[in-house]
């Protein structure tokens, strides 16, 4: 049975594996990104993010499993101009202007975006006549964004797009990115900045040891890692048994203070009160940083349906 055009995902990984020598950089990844979604890819260094992006761009064919973009091989989608990429290690081209560079790249695609439009979306229309090798780091990063837009892609892939940018430059970049995403295109970006993922992405995919360990919204990740943190002073008394209190998923004792990650802070606090152990009581909502650390510190935790926090949303938007 032939799939309808709108049912075909922008990105599809099915049991994808990629090894480098004895290292399984990507280990059985299953991932579907619907058309029109914006998805953040998070993970520690070495988690497999860059290799996953390389497979998506056709740079690393899978050793096992399948990777498809819009229902076809990544290389075909890239050649057709359906994918724009902003790699982490791209270097500025010397002795050419911004307009010349973006225009040259656009000329290589069958149906490019008008150069003026790409420059406008990237927020660098005023820099069209400037030489690329004389721009600041933040300006060069926006030039890379314009280059990625040059083919008028349906999917934009960004590997650490705001790395090494200052706060102001990051804000300007994301304003430009929002303009692109509002046009209904699909965006996949990796980042070390959790607040960016939470603010901009529809979904956050967390990788660890080459596997997907969580996939959901920022709020769903917080709940999966334990919705709240309850802390009490335990100096002078035994912390034994705190990990067994109602709702508690984990307990860490450091410097005379116990920190409990709990799914039910009310039940945990009531149990502490019954024990007379509420000195220095503090209850806080788990942050995305807390969730990330919890999800990526579970040694050997396998990826699978049990770790998918919500079903991927396919917005069924045409490219």
Spans of model-derived segments:
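C-terminal coupling/interaction segments
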Residues: 2-4, 263-319
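Alpha-helical elements of the RecA-like P-loop NTPase motor core of helicases
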Residues: 77, 94, 240, 270, ...
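Short, flexible helix/strand-to-coil boundary loops that buttress conserved ligand/catalytic motifs
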Residues: 78, 225, 295-296
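Glycine-centered loop/turn motif at secondary-structure junctions
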Residues: 123, 184, 246, 275-276
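ABC transporter nucleotide-binding domain
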Residues: 172-262, 282
